[in-house]
Amino acid sequence: MSTLPKTLTLDTSTSRANPTPQPMKRLTVPRIRQRKGGEPIVMLTAYTVRMAQLLDPHCDMLLVGDSLAQVIYGLPHTVGVTMEMMALHGAAVVRGSYHAAVIVDMPFGSYEGSPQQAFDNAARLLKETGAAAVKVEGGKVLAPTIEFLTQRGIPVMGHVGLTPQAVNILGGYGVRGKSEEEARSIVEDAVAVAQAGAFSIVIEGVLESIAIEITNKVACPTIGIGASAQCDGQVLVTDDMLGMFERVPKFVKRYRDMAGVVSGAVQDYADEVRSRSFPTEDQIYAG
């Protein structure tokens, strides 16, 4: 039986949570909506308690993205993600955070069939994770589903432009909106999603002019990823911006080389184990 995660204050100096319950002061969906045109919104992906603890003080939103398919599970794309995966990782991120609004991706196949299917699965995710909202990919075709959800109390973040769950139809992860017809369609998608009640919209992998036009046209905040600095906020896959992978998309800035840091630390450990210089008396219980 699933239960909502307990409210905890987290000690970020360790990997363990302080068991003393404290009042939460999370950013809410209405407060995110109010950020339209204001200070840019900071969003990153998180999949685990510890990463949520580290990101939370600096972020307005944490996205439990279906990008965990590649980052955590080594899958080739996001199509293979399940509801169980999203529920487990979503609950972990909620437990590991206290400030940021947590958004959970709805996996491929969990919402496209009908508005009722989408509601049932979205309600399950919110119940099992304690997250603030769900995110869905799609435009005009999905607008009735978004309206159905929002009218029934489920906050929805939209996602237009390059939609990774549609990789099999799109044929890859190339930039969208290069033709006038496709550019117009993406703008129409975003407007339809906003009018359906989405509280914010991710714009991914489009020409900058398209992202700016959408940001100027819709009343809700836009979150760019490979879009434009003029969006109302930005999101990246955390492991990409930390430099955990050798190959990253053009729109990623590597703020650290964490792959090098981890590799170096493991090499030092391995060398010390093989030379019997670890553990030392500092790490041994004498007796």
Swiss-Prot record:
Catalytic function, reaction form: 3-methyl-2-oxobutanoate + (6R)-5,10-methylene-5,6,7,8-tetrahydrofolate + H2O = 2-dehydropantoate + (6S)-5,6,7,8-tetrahydrofolate
Residue positions of the active site: E204
Cofactor(s) needed: Mg(2+)
Record's keyword annotation contains Nucleotidyltransferase: no
Subcellular location: Cytoplasm
Primary location: cytoplasm
Residue sites binding 3-methyl-2-oxobutanoate per the record: D66, S67, D105, K135
UniProt pathway annotation: Cofactor biosynthesis; (R)-pantothenate biosynthesis; (R)-pantoate from 3-methyl-2-oxobutanoate: step 1/2
Start-end of Polar residues biased regions: 1-19
Signal peptide (residue range): none
Keywords, alphabetical: Cytoplasm, Magnesium, Metal-binding, Pantothenate biosynthesis, Transferase
A single GO molecular function term of this UniProt record: 3-methyl-2-oxobutanoate hydroxymethyltransferase activity
GO biological process: pantothenate biosynthetic process
Region described as Disordered: 1-24
GO cellular component: cytoplasm
EC number from the UniProt entry: 2.1.2.11
InterPro entries xref list: Pantoate_hydroxy_MeTrfase, Pyrv/PenolPyrv_kinase-like_dom, Pyrv_kinase-like_dom_sf
Subunit text: Homodecamer; pentamer of dimers.
PANTHER family linked to this entry: 3-METHYL-2-OXOBUTANOATE HYDROXYMETHYLTRANSFERASE (PTHR20881:SF0)
Record protein name field: 3-methyl-2-oxobutanoate hydroxymethyltransferase
Species assigned in the record: Sphingopyxis alaskensis (strain DSM 13593 / LMG 18877 / RB2256) (Sphingomonas alaskensis)
